[in-house]
């Protein structure tokens, strides 16, 4: 039994070692952590059952170590106890934030055998704690100076300092401890504190919101458009063209010969309603198909009222007749409108006769005659035109009286003066009479005021006072204005009378008269108005010759220039 138990324990140890080798992270830097709790304070409640199981087998393994150096084992055991307590404390406080404690002394690496044994024992415990911390994030220490190799004296001094620090520390709850201790400060060296990693976000290329429309779309886009296109409505197959049915005139039977088979009349088909499609059949039709004419009247069924004759047999259930209605239900736009004649209310019979005459003249075809004299046909009355209410009839009578009264008081929607006076009361009539009297009394003063306001209505500002003279006197006044150098008077006369080319009694023209007076402005004005330069006077002299004889160089140059244009 003992051998079996040993084998079982051996296999369990092998499994644990294999699991630790696969699950343990890479070895961390050697660091001595400071424990702020006593050995008795640390509770075993935070340690899981699996960790306790591993510790049990690890302790049993430590007991088998050969006691080669008893002093070294005691020292290692003394160093192992605070490290185990610190490992338990770090497992509970691993979630707390990192706090840098500054320059903390780290144990220097020595080449002595004592330190190597202690490191080996501590590394075994560190591997056990790393299994629980494998899932936690890796903390980068940063640019931390590693401890340098030193002598045994330096190591003993640092151990003594750490022991004094542990004794002086006070246990404070919820105070985080440094995870990594800093090396001792030496002359000429400094420690760089760890820096928090900065996350750099790279810009992402977002897709454009509006895609550019290509000039030449790809065939794939056309396929997409075709797939998105709306579904076309189902096309109805074309029915065979069939002419509309034609209603043939019925055969009228005499009442004296009773018939056993009733005659059926097809219903009336209005002109504006399309005929329903008729499915073709293999049976030939007995009636010929004729195209309907647009002037064919609409046939409607009517009731038959036979006369009560003793010699004729009455059978209303078997005889039906068709009559043409005189008044159509709907007005056709191709036919002329029927004029409405309004007469006095005491002549109703004449109105009915005139309307009936107009209706019979507008209808192109009449109803077919009935052979039997014993049958009377009742015409279908128009409900819209004939069946009127009492209020409509009264309104028509009132309108007739208003339109056809000889002494009408309404003209273009306004009451006449006589009707206004008749509807006035006494006070309004007296006030109106006083206004009219004042209007008549102020007629003279009103004329004076109007003449003062409109004093210039009969005066044409482009005319002169000589405009009212006769044509002959106008010519004399024109030459008189030239002699007096009156340019404005001459202009007013020329605007009214066509006297530009006229001559005076002495045979002079207006241009020669202006040259004799040496009036350059009058001569230029006449040339601009279009007077003839080549006209001779009674002495057979041209205007240019007179200007040269008078020695007026300005008029001569003006005439020479103007002669080239005439």
Curated annotation (Swiss-Prot):
It comes from the Bacteria. Pfam families: Ank_4 (PF13637). InterPro entries: Ankyrin_rpt, Ankyrin_rpt-contain_sf. SUPFAM superfamilies: Ankyrin repeat. This is Putative ankyrin repeat protein RF_0987. Gene3D superfamilies: Ankyrin repeat-containing domain (1.25.40.20). Residues 101-112, 365-378 have a biased composition (Polar residues). The lineage of its organism: Bacteria, Pseudomonadati, Pseudomonadota, Alphaproteobacteria, Rickettsiales. ANK repeats lie at residues 506-535, 539-566. Keywords: ANK repeat, Repeat.
């Amino acid at each position: 039994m003992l051998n079996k138990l040993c084998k079982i324990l051996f296999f369990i140890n092998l499994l644990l070692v294999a699991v630790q080798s696969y699950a343990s992270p890479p070895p961390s830097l050697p660091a001595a952590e400071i424990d702020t709790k006593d050995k008795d304070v640390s509770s075993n409640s935070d340690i899981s059952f699996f960790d306790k199981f591993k510790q049990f087998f690890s302790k049993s393994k430590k007991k088998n170590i050969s006691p080669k150096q008893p002093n070294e084992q005691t020292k290692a055991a003394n160093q192992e106890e605070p490290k185990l307590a610190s490992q338990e404390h770090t497992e509970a406080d691993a979630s707390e934030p990192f706090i840098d404690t500054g320059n903390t002394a780290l144990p220097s690496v020595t080449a002595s055998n004592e330190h190597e044994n202690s490191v080996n024992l501590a590394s075994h415990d560190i591997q056990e704690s790393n299994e629980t911390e494998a899932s936690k994030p890796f903390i980068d220490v940063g640019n931390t100076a590693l401890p340098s190799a030193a002598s045994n004296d330096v190591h003993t001094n640092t151990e003594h300092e750490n022991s004094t620090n542990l004794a002086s520390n006070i246990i404070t709850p919820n105070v985080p401890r440094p995870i990594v201790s800093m090396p001792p400060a030496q002359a000429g060296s400094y420690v760089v504190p760890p820096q928090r990693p900065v996350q750099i976000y790279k810009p992402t290329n977002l897709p454009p919101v509006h895609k550019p429309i290509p000039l030449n779309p790809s065939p794939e886009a056309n396929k997409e458009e075709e797939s998105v296109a709306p579904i076309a409505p189902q096309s109805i197959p074309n029915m065979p063209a069939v002419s509309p049915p034609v209603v043939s005139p019925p055969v009228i039977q005499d009442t004296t010969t009773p018939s056993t088979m009733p005659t059926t009349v097809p219903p009336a088909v209005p002109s504006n309603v399309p005929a329903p499609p008729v499915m073709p059949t293999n049976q030939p039709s007995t009636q010929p198909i004729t195209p309907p004419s647009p002037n064919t009247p609409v046939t409607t069924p009517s009731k038959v009222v036979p006369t009560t004759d003793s010699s004729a047999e009455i059978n209303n259930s078997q005889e039906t007749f068709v009559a043409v209605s005189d008044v159509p239900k709907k007005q056709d736009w191709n036919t002329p409108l029927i004029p409405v004649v309004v007469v006095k209310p005491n002549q109703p019979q004449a109105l009915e006769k005139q309307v009936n005459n107009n209706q019979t003249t507008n209808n192109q075809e009449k109803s077919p005659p009935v052979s039997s004299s014993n049958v009377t046909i009742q015409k279908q009355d128009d409900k819209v035109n004939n069946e009127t209410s009492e209020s409509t009839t009264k309104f028509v009578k009132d309108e007739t009286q208003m339109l056809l009264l000889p002494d009408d008081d309404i003209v273009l929607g306004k009451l006449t003066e006589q009707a206004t006076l008749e509807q006035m009361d006494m006070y309004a009539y007296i006030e109106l009479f006083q206004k009219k009297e004042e209007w008549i009394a102020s007629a003279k003063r009103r004329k004076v005021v109007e003449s003062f306001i409109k004093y210039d209505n009969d005066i044409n500002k482009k005319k002169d006072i000589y405009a009212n003279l006769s044509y002959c006197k106008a010519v004399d006044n024109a030459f008189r204005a030239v002699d007096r150098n009156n340019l404005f008077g001459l202009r007013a006369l020329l605007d009214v009378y066509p006297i530009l080319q006229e001559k005076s009694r002495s045979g002079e023209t207006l241009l020669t008269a202006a040259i004799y007076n040496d009036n350059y402005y009058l001569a230029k004005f006449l040339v601009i108005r279009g007077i003839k330069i080549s006209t001779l006077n009674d002495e057979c002299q041209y205007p240019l010759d007179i200007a040269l004889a008078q020695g007026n160089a300005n008029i001569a140059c003006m005439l020479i220039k103007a002669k080239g244009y005439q």
